[in-house]
């Protein structure tokens, strides 16, 4: 937990002071901190508790060395400190605890070594013992801001027979920059800090009662002659907390308590990345992967059986049998096993729109979204594959069936993206069909060479693209809503390519949710046609193109989702018995 725990004291001579603080260090300690100990002075060892190893390093400093440390410290000068304002002796390096589980160090000093942290702790100390006080001046309170951090403060009194009112004022503060985390930790911190305070007050009460029994200060003060002039009281008005509790190991114990408090509070609340339900694309990809693994297992089993039964064949025959034909390789590629080229010719939808032109791209995108067959004829296989890789981003994964490159025409039920070599003949009914679009790639004449809008990629300037269809999309046709939004995003030059990709993901998720509602409404609940029309108008998809798009995208729903909906349908007998 990134926090600082500090013990503060209100000195009658110097005001609010920080006595002791423990901070968390995630980075290695600076060179020289605790590494200059001589073997004779040694390191006192060390107690392991809860995965934390505590080192108490005591070094003997010369006066000159102590003075140099004091001058570089951001804390108050020695002349401004009394016995009650000081915790560790001059030259004491502090306490360090190593957490072996997380490689975190918990370091305790009288003041933080960093000037900015010292300022934050100093301000929190002053506020906790002056203006930010719980009613009754003893108890917990929360205050702070974004600039100086947020503070959980618990003020309390310690008995002192020589102090005004026989008690001194202290506070334990916890400082964090995360307000929500600190508020959620309030019950935990309150209980543990209250335990530390009770222990300190119990020790001080025993010392106070012993001193009162030996020399009652109340009787002595009552017998003192009254004078209207101010004078210094008898005894030491500035007593250290170690003398008030009669505990020489007080600071080591406080370091252990504060280090455990920081570790336990940080381990108590942890952040977890909560992902939502898997999208339809994720479910479809998982189903395809499972099918491929199942096929490979069955293929391996059948090969093993054939090897046991069949005789050994010559090498040439074996190689010929394992070679797949063009149709087989194309169909396997449609299952997602083909690898797109590393440097695509078409880089994005925006790039393709610049190359083809706005009217041709709109026609092509309309056919893609409607589920019609998209045929590319080109000698460049990489060009065709890059085009399909870009166009498939407009569809859900379950609606994509690709044959990247084939030497013969494949029917539309087998694929909606088909790559063909230029010499392949397309059937006449496909050429005149309104459910297909053909993109022919020809070598451009020198007179028709033109820039494609990308200075760093001139590979497409040698091509000419002709987009034809049996049912060209009219320029004044509204088209599906998602197509208009995609074009608006592509034409907005203020949006980068990455932002457009994320916008496309959001649009697909939006329309897949509409598809799920329509599927549940029509296929599962079997609602009448009138109710379906009302639902489509509510979804904002009552236009003809939107309805066709929803019906096509419905084929991309995962089997998992469909089976889940079907299994939750109540049988007529069960519903009648409930009624």
Curated annotation (Swiss-Prot):
Family annotation (InterPro entries): FLCN/SMCR8_DENN, FLCN_DENN_C_sf, Folliculin, Folliculin/SMCR8_longin, Folliculin_DENN
Family annotation (Pfam families): Folliculin (PF11704), Folliculin_C (PF16692)
Tissue distribution of the protein: Expressed in most tissues tested, including skin, lung, kidney, heart, testis and stomach.
Domain annotation cDENN FLCN/SMCR8-type: ranges: 339-491
An example Gene Ontology biological process: phosphatidylinositol 3-kinase/protein kinase B signal transduction
Keyword Membrane (UniProt): yes
Documented effect of changing residue 362 to C: Found in a colorectal cell line; impaired protein stability
UniProt modified residues of type Phosphoserine: 62, 73, 302, 406, 537, 542, 571
Residue ranges of domain uDENN FLCN/SMCR8-type in the record: 86-242
Site annotation Essential for GTPase activation (GAP) activity: residues: 164
Residues in dDENN FLCN/SMCR8-type domain copies: 493-558
Keyword Membrane attributed: yes
Any one GO molecular-function label of the UniProt entry: enzyme inhibitor activity
Family, as annotated: Belongs to the folliculin family.
Illness: Birt-Hogg-Dube syndrome 1: A form of Birt-Hogg-Dube syndrome, a rare genodermatosis usually manifesting in adulthood and characterized by multiple fibrofolliculomas, trichodiscomas, and acrochordons. Patients with this syndrome have an increased susceptibility to develop renal cell carcinoma, lung cysts, and spontaneous pneumothorax. Inheritance is autosomal dominant. Primary spontaneous pneumothorax: Condition in which air is present in the pleural space in the absence of a precipitating event, such as trauma or lung disease. This results in secondary collapse of the lung, either partially or completely, and some degree of hypoxia. PSP is relatively common, with an incidence between 7.4-18/100'000 for men and 1.2-6/100'000 for women and a dose-dependent, increased risk among smokers. Most cases are sporadic, typically occurring in tall, thin men aged 10-30 years and generally while at rest.
Function (record text): Multi-functional protein, involved in both the cellular response to amino acid availability and in the regulation of glycolysis. GTPase-activating protein that plays a key role in the cellular response to amino acid availability through regulation of the non-canonical mTORC1 signaling cascade controlling the MiT/TFE factors TFEB and TFE3. Activates mTORC1 by acting as a GTPase-activating protein: specifically stimulates GTP hydrolysis by RagC/RRAGC or RagD/RRAGD, promoting the conversion to the GDP-bound state of RagC/RRAGC or RagD/RRAGD, and thereby activating the kinase activity of mTORC1.
Subunit structure: Interacts (via C-terminus) with FNIP1 or FNIP2 (via C-terminus). Component of the lysosomal folliculin complex (LFC), composed of FLCN, FNIP1 (or FNIP2), RagA/RRAGA or RagB/RRAGB GDP-bound, RagC/RRAGC or RagD/RRAGD GTP-bound, and Ragulator. Interaction with FNIP1 or FNIP2 mediates indirect interaction with the PRKAA1, PRKAB1 and PRKAG1 subunits of 5'-AMP-activated protein kinase (AMPK). Interacts with HSP90AA1 in the presence of FNIP1. Interacts with HSP70, STUB1, CDC37, AHSA1, CCT2, STIP1, PTGES3 and PPP5C.
Protein name as catalogued: Folliculin
Gene name for this UniProt entry: FLCN
């Amino acid at each position: 937990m990134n926090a600082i725990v500090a013990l503060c004291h209100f000195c009658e001579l110097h005001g609010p002071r920080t006595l002791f603080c423990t901070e968390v260090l995630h980075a290695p300690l600076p060179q020289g901190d605790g590494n200059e100990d001589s073997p004779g002075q040694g390191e006192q060892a060390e107690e392991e508790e809860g995965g934390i190893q505590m080192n108490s390093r005591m070094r003997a400093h010369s006066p000159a060395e102590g003075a140099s440390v004091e001058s570089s410290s951001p804390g108050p000068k020695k002349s401004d400190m009394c016995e009650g304002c000081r915790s560790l002796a001059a030259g004491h390096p502090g306490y360090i605890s190593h957490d072996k589980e997380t490689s975190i160090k918990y370091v305790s000093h009288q003041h933080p070594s960093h000037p900015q942290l010292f300022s934050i702790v100093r301000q929190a100390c002053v506020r906790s013992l002056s203006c930010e006080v719980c009613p009754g001046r003893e108890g917990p309170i929360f205050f702070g801001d974004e600039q100086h951090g947020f503070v959980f403060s618990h003020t309390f009194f310690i008995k002192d027979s020589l102090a005004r009112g026989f008690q001194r004022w202290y506070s334990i503060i916890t400082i964090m920059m995360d307000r929500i985390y600190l508020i959620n930790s309030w019950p935990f911190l309150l209980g543990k800090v209250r335990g530390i305070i009770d222990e300190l007050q119990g020790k001080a009460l025993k010392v106070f009662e012993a001193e009162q029994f030996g020399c009652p200060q109340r009787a002595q003060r009552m017998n003192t002659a009254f004078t209207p002039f101010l004078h210094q009281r008898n005894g030491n008005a500035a007593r250290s907390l170690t003398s008030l509790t009669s505990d020489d190991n007080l600071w080591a114990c406080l370091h252990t308590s504060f280090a455990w408090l920081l570790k336990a509070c940080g381990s108590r609340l942890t952040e977890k990345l909560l992902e939502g339900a898997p999208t339809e694309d994720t479910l479809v990809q998982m189903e395809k992967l499972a099918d491929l693994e199942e096929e490979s297992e069955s293929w391996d089993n059948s090969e093993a059986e054939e090897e046991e039964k069949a005789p050994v064949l010559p090498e040439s025959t074996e190689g010929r049998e394992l070679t797949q034909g063009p149709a087989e390789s194309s169909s396997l590629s449609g299952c997602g096993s083909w690898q797109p080229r590393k440097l695509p010719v078409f880089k994005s939808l925006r790039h393709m729109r610049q190359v083809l032109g706005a009217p041709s791209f709109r026609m092509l995108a309309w056919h893609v979204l409607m589920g019609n067959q998209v045929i590319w004829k080109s000698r460049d296989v990489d060009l065709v594959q890059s085009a399909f890789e870009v166009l498939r981003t407009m569809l859900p994964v379950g609606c994509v069936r690709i044959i990247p490159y084939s030497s013969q025409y494949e029917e539309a039920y087998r694929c909606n993206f088909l790559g063909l070599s230029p010499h392949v003949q397309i059937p006449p009914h496909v050429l005149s069909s309104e459910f297909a679009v053909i993109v022919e790639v020809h070598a451009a004449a020198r007179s028709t060479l033109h820039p494609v809008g990308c200075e760093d990629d001139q590979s497409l300037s040698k091509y000419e693209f002709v987009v034809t269809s049996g049912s060209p999309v009219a320029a004044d046709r509204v088209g599906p809503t998602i197509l208009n939004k995609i074009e608006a995003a592509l034409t907005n030059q203020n949006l980068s390519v990455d932002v457009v990709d994320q916008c496309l993901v959001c649009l697909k998720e939006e329309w897949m949710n509409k598809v799920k509602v329509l599927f549940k409404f029509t296929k599962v609940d079997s609602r009448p046609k009138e109710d379906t029309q009302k639902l489509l108008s509510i979804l904002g998809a009552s236009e003809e193109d939107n309805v066709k798009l929803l019906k096509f995208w419905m084929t991309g729903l995962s089997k998992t989702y469909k089976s889940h909906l079907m299994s939750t349908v109540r049988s007529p007998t069960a519903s009648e018995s409930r009624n």
